[in-house]
Amino acid sequence: MIISSWNVNSVRVRLNHILEYLKKKKPNFLLLQEIKTENKNFPYSELKEIGYDSEVHGQKSYNGVAIIYNKKINNINFNVINDDQEQSRTISVDINYQNELIKIICVYVPNGNPVDTDKYQYKIKWLKSFDKFLINQNKLKKKIIIGGDFNIIPNETDVYNPEDWENDALYRVEIRKFFRKILNEGYDDAFRLINKEPNNYTFWDYQYGSFEKNKGLRIDHFLLSKNISHLIKDVTIDKYLRTLERPSDHAPIKLTLA
């Protein structure tokens, strides 16, 4: 089974790229972030034409997440955590895979910049709420796959120039501690189980020739609860999509399960 995750930075602008990706890579699930559209304007019919259904938690012009799928799903939840700002950042579905009930969660974590504003405090509050949710899931021994744009650079090997990012909301010590806390509570960073090498990024700024110079960040992740991390067969970054005309500034990450 293949699950991909991609911050598309506008589903309407990137629709042709999405359709081609689905046809080429044939994931069973595609988790989208920053779709930047309301549900009524989501391209359901175009996706249906190539064999995919969609569950969408949209928002006008900002944020928004979706799960595109060609397998049976159950128990759709459009608000995994309580968000007092009512931003569209989470969606989850349950699936059966190899006789296991697994919850797939698509997340778009707040960016948090600038750090001296309410945006950073919102990110902290959001992460605390998400962590509380995961602790509860762990107590219930749930099997979880979390995929999405976490807006967190986990380690210095996940950013081209760590010194430049020390006070950024994606890399501050406080933020990285949240990521480690989640891992310590019973989750694995799927990519790092497979690939220990530095300079593997999922995001490159549109400016300064960042992609060509590989000045990027690894901020898009798959986290799996340890009770199913043995199913991980491979995790790759589909960087070729970043070379297309009018690309997203993120590349998809692809999780293959045995």
Residues covered by each model-derived region:
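Conserved beta strand-loop-helix elements of the APE1-like EEP
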Residues: S61-I76, P198, S210-L231, L257
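Structured beta-strand-rich core segments of catalytic domains in phosphoester-bond hydrolases
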Residues: I35-E38, F42-P114
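Surface polyanion/phosphate-binding segment centered on an Asp-His-Pro turn
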Residues: T236-A258
